[in-house]
Each structure stands twice: as structure tokens, then as C-alpha cells.
Curated annotation (Swiss-Prot):
<keyword id="KW-0548">Nucleotidyltransferase</keyword>
<keyword id="KW-0547">Nucleotide-binding</keyword>
<keyword id="KW-0067">ATP-binding</keyword>
<feature type="binding site">
    <location>
        <position position="42"/>
    </location>
    <ligand>
        <name>substrate</name>
    </ligand>
</feature>
<feature type="binding site">
    <location>
        <position position="100"/>
    </location>
    <ligand>
        <name>ATP</name>
    </ligand>
</feature>
<keyword id="KW-0460">Magnesium</keyword>
<dbReference type="GO" id="GO:0015937">
    <property type="term" value="P:coenzyme A biosynthetic process"/>
</dbReference>
<feature type="binding site">
    <location>
        <position position="75"/>
    </location>
    <ligand>
        <name>substrate</name>
    </ligand>
</feature>
<feature type="site" description="Transition state stabilizer">
    <location>
        <position position="18"/>
    </location>
</feature>
<protein>
    <recommendedName>
        <fullName>Phosphopantetheine adenylyltransferase</fullName>
        <ecNumber>2.7.7.3</ecNumber>
    </recommendedName>
</protein>
<comment type="similarity">
    <text>Belongs to the bacterial CoaD family.</text>
</comment>
<comment type="function">
    <text>Reversibly transfers an adenylyl group from ATP to 4'-phosphopantetheine, yielding dephospho-CoA (dPCoA) and pyrophosphate.</text>
</comment>
<feature type="binding site">
    <location>
        <position position="89"/>
    </location>
    <ligand>
        <name>substrate</name>
    </ligand>
</feature>
<dbReference type="InterPro" id="IPR004821">
    <property type="entry name" value="Cyt_trans-like"/>
</dbReference>
<keyword id="KW-0808">Transferase</keyword>
<keyword id="KW-0173">Coenzyme A biosynthesis</keyword>
<feature type="binding site">
    <location>
        <position position="10"/>
    </location>
    <ligand>
        <name>substrate</name>
    </ligand>
</feature>
Amino acid sequence: MTRKAIYPGTFDPFTNGHLDVLERALNIFDHVEVVLAENSQKQTLFSVDERLEMVHEVVREFSNVSVDVLHAGLLADYARQAGASAIVRGVRQVKDFEYEFQMSLLNRHLYPEVTTVFLMPNVKYTYVASTIIREVSMLGGDVSKFVHPFVLDKLNAKRAEREGQS
């Protein structure tokens, strides 16, 4: 029996911290599906298609990773339909855990067969958040140590595009 997990997130952009959590999940599960949440409530820098392209590029070396988009609906329903036994969540700090713990309880209520697995990234990524990466990059800071080169190119292009508009 294949042990499958889903790893949901906005991934705006996908960072080395996300990649680290994914690699840790692959040590536990046979297959991990990265699920991009469209999340209309969040203001994103990149479109869903741009984020999908970046994640595909970063994970293409892994034969046991797939990528999909959750356009609408409940994550618990998506997990059930995908045949996943677990939802992987990266937790960098206590405040992440508090929110994720509440969500895991709700998901367990909706889909008792699924387990939420909390994974901590390598300590060098504990302060790396997509929000910080976006802000630093858009201000011209060097984020090359925190994202894949393909993602860095996309961030630089987005910054150049914004600078051209002002």
C-alpha cells in the first residue's frame, strides 16, 4: 500500500524552507502531492499559474512528487479524493503550530482517516517565510540563499516588471 500525503500551501513563492519540509515528508511517505491553494482571500505576488510553474520546476527531480491546485473547497475533501492518508504542514515557530493545530483538529473532524503531520524545517530556514522573501526581493535584497534559482529569476523578473510600471 502506497503511503500518500498532500502538502498544501499558497507557496508565494516556494522557498527552500518549503523544499526542506517536502524532502522530510518524502522520508516518511511514498508519494507527496504539493497542493497549491488558490486562496482568493490572500493577496499574492504570483498568479496560480506562475506558482504552479515554479513548484513544478523546483520538484521536477522527484519522481514521487506531483503538483496540483486546489481552486475551491475544503482541504479535507481534497485529501479524501486524492487518497491521501496525511496532510503535511511545515511549522517554523510556536505561532505557526497554534494555527495549524486548530486546522488539524477541524480536518480530523471532517475526515477522521487523515492525520496531520507537523514537520519542522532545518533550523537555517526557521525564519524564512514567503512573505519575508517577497518583501526583501521586491526591495532589491538578495534572497538567493532561500529560493531555487528558477524562483529567484521569477522574483527578479517580477521586481523589474513592477519597477517598470512606476
